[in-house]
């Protein structure tokens, strides 16, 4: 007798559930996507004990025909595709017919549905077996209750995390769905308390504000662009609003949230050098394309897709993000922080030993005003905005530990630069490089220097504070970016050629990238086994640091493995600009300071240093008047901040 036999349908469904239904958040995702496919305008999600006890999803969609209710729980039964051709042009969220039978095989499911023109139907299934099926009173749409998850597979329960973690995963799923479908009203209720609600009015900024906070919504910029195959639209944050991880970037393909490293990388690349190292923007990007160009049938949970013409899409995404950011005035304005302090402040007297309290918005965010250490001095305490809804407040707390890279968060280098003449570090030659950004950068009048680190200047619209190190670093960066690569005429010989020794593996990598190194001025010649000789170096190398600079550039190639000439030159320019820039606590005379301010507007990007830190922050005249309480501020309704329509 043969050893191979066919598994029964219940066991097969349980095996399939292992891939599709990993945790309560998986149930929320699958059921909510079914509701979206049913053209629902409202989807209410109710969970108890983080979904470990029950998950309920109610929608106002098309409902299920009475004859199809039981059939919907058969494996691979679906209304969304009919033949093999449909599999390559999927336009719905689901299409495999796996979700409902997988859920029903490991849980207790009660489904009630109606199509509007007929009597409702109800079915009760547990462990894959139908317990009851018949007519029921129901409003149009579908109401499905899932309870006792994994009751018959207790081993699966061991791999679930704490209720807090499981709830966080559900919240993340609902957030992504709401961002992908701003025209659908979502609500999420946990243990009887509503924690999220979106209006479903199509205003994406309002959804962002409900999830990430009102200030985040205000700092989002619209992006839009297309080519013959792709259409990109959505919102990205200004460079001053960042997070420590990539998880706040939501990228959708035809309104389906997906994970794609190349697209995420392109989105970040669109900011060029405007982001600080290790910081990432908030973004909500949707890419509309012909379904033929994307294969969504490559991952059990459909989180990953395979794209045709991906390089073309990567270029388009990077370009539209870059264009959107370049059109903005990127000088951080302190108006939002001043408004927050003056319209919702509460002044208390703190003893000398008390630690200064800061806004609840971010536990690690520095306060706008540092309190005096002397006893009895006022400490500013910001309160939660009364304009935000309870749902917005709840989700602000959800993200309260994330930093916002405001101008007050930029810390100057505390080390004192030892005396080198400032005139050697600040070039007084003002070259004519054009004024690409001059229209967006103000005409500044120099006032003075603060702490040997910041330059104070004024313009017609208020006070500007310029970080002198960041300013010259930006000027140097754009100079070196152009100079690196002009190797034929700008080489200087070493008195004694350098001999660089490496391991066999590293030597092979260097040989592979010799062309990149040569294009940037490092002409390495083989010199024995696993060794190279360097006879000359570019003239832009810092005097006395030629060998260190050469080794550092080679180390970049070894670390990256794959590096284009463009990327290599950018990295080298960043290194050189930082090494030759004036440091904090370095005194400049008036002539040197004015020369620095005069060169800054000539930069292609005068707003950020190459590492992404802001060069300048701005106090408008209105901000100053508010700080001194010379004017009062009126409150505006929360929704008005993100209303795209005029009255």
Curated annotation (Swiss-Prot):
Keywords: DNA damage, DNA repair
Cystines in this chain: none
Chain residue ranges for the region called Disordered: 346-378
Any one Gene Ontology BP term: mismatch repair
Pfam families hit by this protein: DNA_mis_repair, HATPase_c_3, MutL_C
The family this protein is said to belong to: Belongs to the DNA mismatch repair MutL/HexB family.
PANTHER family recorded: DNA MISMATCH REPAIR PROTEIN MLH, PMS, MUTL, DNA MISMATCH REPAIR PROTEIN MLH1
Protein's recorded name: DNA mismatch repair protein MutL
The encoding gene: mutL
């Amino acid at each position: 007798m043969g050893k191979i036999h066919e598994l029964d349908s219940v066991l097969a469904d349980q095996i399939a559930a292992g891939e599709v239904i990993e945790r309560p958040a998986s149930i929320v995702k699958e059921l909510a996507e079914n509701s979206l496919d049913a053209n629902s305008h409202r989807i209410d999600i109710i969970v108890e004990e983080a979904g470990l006890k029950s998950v309920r999803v109610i929608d106002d969609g098309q409902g299920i025909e009475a004859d199809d209710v039981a059939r919907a729980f058969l494996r691979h039964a679906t209304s969304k595709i009919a033949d093999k051709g449909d599999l390559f042009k999927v336009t719905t969220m689901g299409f495999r017919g796996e979700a409902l039978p997988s859920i029903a095989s490991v849980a207790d499911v009660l489904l009630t549905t109606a199509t509007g023109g007929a009597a409702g139907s109800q079915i009760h299934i547990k462990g894959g077996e139908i317990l009851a099926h018949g007519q029921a009173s129901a409003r149009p749409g579908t109401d499905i209750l899932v309870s006792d998850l994994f009751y018959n597979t207790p081993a699966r329960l061991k791999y679930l995390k704490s209720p807090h973690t499981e709830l966080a995963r559900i919240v993340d799923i609902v957030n992504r769905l709401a961002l992908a479908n701003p025209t659908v009203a979502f609500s999420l209720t946990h243990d009887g308390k509503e924690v999220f609600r979106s209006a479903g009015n199509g205003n994406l900024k309002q959804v962002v504000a409900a999830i990430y906070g009102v200030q985040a919504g205000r700092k989002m910029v619209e992006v839009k662009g297309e080519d013959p195959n792709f259409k990109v639209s959505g919102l990205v944050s200004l460079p001053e609003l960042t997070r420590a991880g990539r998880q706040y970037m939501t990228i959708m393909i035809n309104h389906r949230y997906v994970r794609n490293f190349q697209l995420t990388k392109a989105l970040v690349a669109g900011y060029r050098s405007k982001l600080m190292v290790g910081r990432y923007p908030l973004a909500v990007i949707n890419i509309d394309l012909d379904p033929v160009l994307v294969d969504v049938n490559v991952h059990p949970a459909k989180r990953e897709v395979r794209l045709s013409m991906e390089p073309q899409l990567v270029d388009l995404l990077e370009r539209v993000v870059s264009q959107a950011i370049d059109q903005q005035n990127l000088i951080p304005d302190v108006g939002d922080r001043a408004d927050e302090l003056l319209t919702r402040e509460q002044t208390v007297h703190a003893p000398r030993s008390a630690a200064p309290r800061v806004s609840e918005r971010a536990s690690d965010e520095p306060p706008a005003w540092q309190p005096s250490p002397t006893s009895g001095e006022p400490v500013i305490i910001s309160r939660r905005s009364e304009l935000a809804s309870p749902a917005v407040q709840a989700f602000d707390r959800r993200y309260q530990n994330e930093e916002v890279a405001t101008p007050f968060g930029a810390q100057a280098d505390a080390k004192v630069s030892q005396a080198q003449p400032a005139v050697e570090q600040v070039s007084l030659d003002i070259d004519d490089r054009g004024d690409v950004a001059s229209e967006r950068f103000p005409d500044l009048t120099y006032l003075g220097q603060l702490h040997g680190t910041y330059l104070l200047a004024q313009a017609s619209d208020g006070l500007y504070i310029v970080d002198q190190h960041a300013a010259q670093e930006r000027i140097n960066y754009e100079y070196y970016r152009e100079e690196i690569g002009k190797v034929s005429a700008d080489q200087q010989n070493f008195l004694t050629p350098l001999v660089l020794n490496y391991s066999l593996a590293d030597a092979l990598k260097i040989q592979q990238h010799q062309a990149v190194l040569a294009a940037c001025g490092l002409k390495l010649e083989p010199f024995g086994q696993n060794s190279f000789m360097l006879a000359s170096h570019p003239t832009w190398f810092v005097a006395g640091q030629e060998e260190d600079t050469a080794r550092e550039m080679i180390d970049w190639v070894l670390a990256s493995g794959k590096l284009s000439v463009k990327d290599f030159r950018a990295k080298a320019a960043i290194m050189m600009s930082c090494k030759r820039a004036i440091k904090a606590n370095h005194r400049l005379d008036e002539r040197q300071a004015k020369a620095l301010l005069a060169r800054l507007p000539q930069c292609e990007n005068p707003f950020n240093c190459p590492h992404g830190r802001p060069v300048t922050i701005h106090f408008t005249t209105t901000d100053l008047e508010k700080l001194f309480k010379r004017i009062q501020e009126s409150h505006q309704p929360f929704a008005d901040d993100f209303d795209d329509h005029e009255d």
